[in-house]
Design a protein with these regions (language model features):
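Beta-strand/loop-rich accessory regions of lumenal/periplasmic or secreted enzymes
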Residues: 29-36, 66-345
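Intrinsically disordered, low-complexity Pro/Gly/Ser/Thr-rich segments with frequent PxxP/GP/PP motifs
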Residues: 2-46, 50-56
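Short beta-strand elements
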Residues: 50-76
Length: 345
């Protein structure tokens, strides 16, 4: 079948009779492609008849070929400049049906509203830490990587700067990591005058630190924003070293369903290759995260990485009060060569 941005445009079924150990080439009639977007040719091999080992229609293999058609047209838009307020503590951007407030004391965005609905409860925080897995613990990673825990969680907010552009307001917050050797990193918010918000975390790298578990931005959102759908690799959780069996498509789940029932709470629910992610409540109030250039990794859970880290068992987790959305540039894999010393690849 042919898909565009996860939506099936055309599908077809044909039969093959290929003896074991041989191969055969089939000619496909391809759908005409005349618009920009990401396209996927998806081929799935299923059993034609019921056998002793599988029912008819059982998938035994699949493959996907992904390609993109660029849109070279530059849209002509006339933007009405929103009201920008520069206060002692708050910088506010107020436009038609949206408002954004940036806190110079807190060090980030403190309010994001669309149609008077508030989406965040606290300034998003950069995190370099994940809740350690059983494999991580077996490889002594909590000890080896401990500096990354403090680096993000206890980072010191230092300065803020801003630049008003023709069609956006760019605000950059600078932090100093709580580790030795220390380093600075920035979070830049670009408040576009059409209501979109661009976010960029910049980490230049530092020598003398162990491998980084994750580079992510954590959003603490309202509890009712617990449903999510995304276009990326799925349908189940997957990681950089556990994604070969995942397929690109449109998937949906909830924060509760995304929490794995491990005896010892730990990192779970990650997705790789994500192009877009929409988090919404039952009334369809929603916020969409979209890739800027490269696909990202993400998770939507009822607990933060630090809450999962602190609990020894599931019943020690607190009552659900928020939905935690993690947008990550990259996270290390989960390993599995063994659980008593082998690090992740």
């Amino acid at each position: 079948r042919l898909e565009k941005n996860g939506v099936v445009l055309k599908s077809d079924t044909f039969s093959l009779n290929v003896p074991a150990g041989e191969s055969k080439t089939m000619k496909l009639t391809l759908h005409k492609i005349d618009s920009a977007g990401e396209y996927v040719y998806h081929v799935s091999a299923v059993t034609a008849d019921q056998t002793l080992w599988a029912d008819a229609g059982h998938e035994i293999a699949f493959a996907q070929e992904v390609f993109e058609v660029k849109d070279n047209q530059i849209p002509e838009t006339t933007l009405q400049k929103p009201t920008i307020v520069y206060g002692d503590v708050i910088i506010g951007v107020h436009g038609e049906n949206f408002s954004m407030m940036f806190d110079k004391k807190e060090g980030g965005i403190s309010s994001l509203k669309y149609n008077d609905f508030e989406y965040i409860t606290r300034t998003p925080k950069v995190s370099f830490w994940r809740a350690m897995t059983d494999n991580d613990t077996g490889a002594s990673e909590p000890y080896n990587l401990a500096q990354w825990y403090a680096a993000g969680k206890f980072a010191k907010y230092k300065t803020v700067s801003w630049l008003e552009q023709e069609d956006a307001l760019k605000i950059t917050f600078t932090y100093q990591a709580a580790c030795i050797p220390t380093f600075e990193f920035t979070v830049t918010y670009t408040a576009h005058f059409d209501g979109k918000l661009g976010v960029c975390v910049n980490y230049a790298g530092v020598s003398g630190m162990p491998d980084m578990p994750v580079l992510a931005l954590d959003f603490k959102m309202k509890k009712q924003l617990c449903n999510f759908r995304y276009y990326g690799l799925g349908p189940d959780e997957n990681y950089s070293d556990r994604c070969k069996g995942a397929r690109l498509g449109l998937w949906k789940s909830t924060a509760k369903e995304n929490l794995s029932g491990y005896l010892n709470p730990q990192e779970c629910g990650n997705r790789t290759g994500v192009r877009t992610l929409s988090v919404h409540d039952d009334m369809q109030h929603g916020l969409t995260f979209q890739k800027a250039s490269a696909p990202f990794e993400m998770s939507v859970l009822p607990y933060s990485a630090y809450e999962l880290e602190n609990a020894m068992h599931l019943d020690e987790l607190p009552s659900v009060r928020y939905t935690w959305v993690r947008i990550a540039a990259k996270q290390m894999g989960v390993g599995g060569d063994d659980s008593w010393g082998a690090p992740v690849h």
